[in-house]
């Protein structure tokens, strides 16, 4: 008969007690060891981390404005450079 029953079910320690209660006790002991309260996050030190903390974590729309201004400035710079190179050729 013991060859048909898996070893975990047929163990002597589980025969006299409720296995569900033992499993629940393991879960309770695991969760009781976890820290409680607010999680503390390390402060950002890099410029990108500070930017993310200031604008992205607060849900601000400023990064969209910053990105559009950046692309506008880069586009203007490229147009100006290639316009000057066009004048050198002619």
UniProtKB/Swiss-Prot annotation:
Q: Does the keyword Calcium apply?
A: no
- Entry keyword set: ATP synthesis, CF(0), Hydrogen ion transport, Ion transport, Membrane, Mitochondrion, Mitochondrion inner membrane, Transport
Q: Which GO terms describe its cellular component?
A: mitochondrial inner membrane; proton-transporting ATP synthase complex
Please list the GO terms describing molecular function: proton-transporting ATP synthase activity, rotational mechanism
Statement: the UniProt record of this protein carries the keyword Membrane: yes
Name the Pfam families for this protein.
F1F0-ATPsyn_F
Q: Where in the cell is it found?
A: Mitochondrion inner membrane
Q: InterPro entries in the record, alphabetically?
A: ATP_synth_F0_fsu_mt_fun (IPR019727)
Assembly with partners or alone: F-type ATP synthases have 2 components, the catalytic core F(1) and the membrane-embedded component F(0), linked together by a central stalk and a peripheral stalk. The central stalk, also called rotor shaft, is often seen as part of F(1). The peripheral stalk is seen as part of F(0). F(0) contains the membrane channel next to the rotor. F-type ATP synthases form dimers but each monomer functions independently in ATP generation.
Describe the task this protein carries out: Mitochondrial membrane ATP synthase (F(1)F(0) ATP synthase or Complex V) produces ATP from ADP in the presence of a proton gradient across the membrane which is generated by electron transport complexes of the respiratory chain. F-type ATP synthases consist of two structural domains, F(1) - containing the extramembraneous catalytic core, and F(0) - containing the membrane proton channel, linked together by a central stalk and a peripheral stalk.
Q: Which family does it belong to?
A: Belongs to the ATPase F chain family.
Spell out the protein name for this chain: ATP synthase subunit f, mitochondrial
| Gene this chain is encoded by | ATP17
């Amino acid at each position: 008969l013991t060859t048909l029953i898996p070893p975990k079910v047929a163990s002597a320690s589980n025969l006299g007690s409720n296995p569900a209660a033992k499993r629940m006790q393991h879960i309770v002991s695991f969760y009781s060891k976890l820290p409680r309260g607010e999680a503390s996050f390390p402060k950002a030190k890099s410029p990108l981390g500070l930017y993310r903390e200031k604008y992205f974590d607060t849900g601000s729309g400023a990064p969209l404005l910053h990105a559009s201004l950046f692309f506008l400035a880069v586009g203007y710079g490229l147009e100006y450079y290639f316009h000057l190179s066009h004048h050198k050729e002619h």
